[in-house]
Amino acid sequence: EHSQNITPDDQRRFVELDIIPSMQPSHAIGDLHFAIDRLGLDRINNAYAWRNLIDQGLIIAGGTDAPVEIGDPRIEFYAAVTRKDLDGFHAEGWNLDQKLTRYEALKMFTIWPAIASFEEEAKGTIEVGKFADFSIFDKDLMSIPEQKILEANNILTVVNGRVVFQE
């Protein structure tokens, strides 16, 4: 949990031991205003190293850490694909190369957590026989400009096959 600042040696051990880290992208954009000062430039290179971990063959279980963080899936998705704060700011040395593709970010909050909890047969994808938990937005998060992600509105939420919210 909170695999935010792990050394290269620890990253290798994650791979060797097939550890699935749990990370909260909103922590990265919340921390960017002070993390470099607290961790220093050497250590910040390994902070929130999503790309490094995925490129080594790991999956990442994403979470919101609510109620510590807001718990808004748009913020988590935006943070994962931009590594910028809600105003579009990113700090020098913040390693934008560690951001995820939109497809990876989607998996970070769907199938990868299901795999991490050994529930991929029941969760993580929309298929017959699965729980069918999902939200639909009024904009396509996979294709709109990144600054528009936060403007998308939830128009439908389904939990366990039942509509729990509809605009």
PLM region descriptions:
Residues 1-8:
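Active-site glycine- and acidic-residue-rich loops that bind
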Residues 8, 12, 16-141, 147, ...:
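His/Asp/Glu-enriched, well-ordered alpha-helical/loop segment
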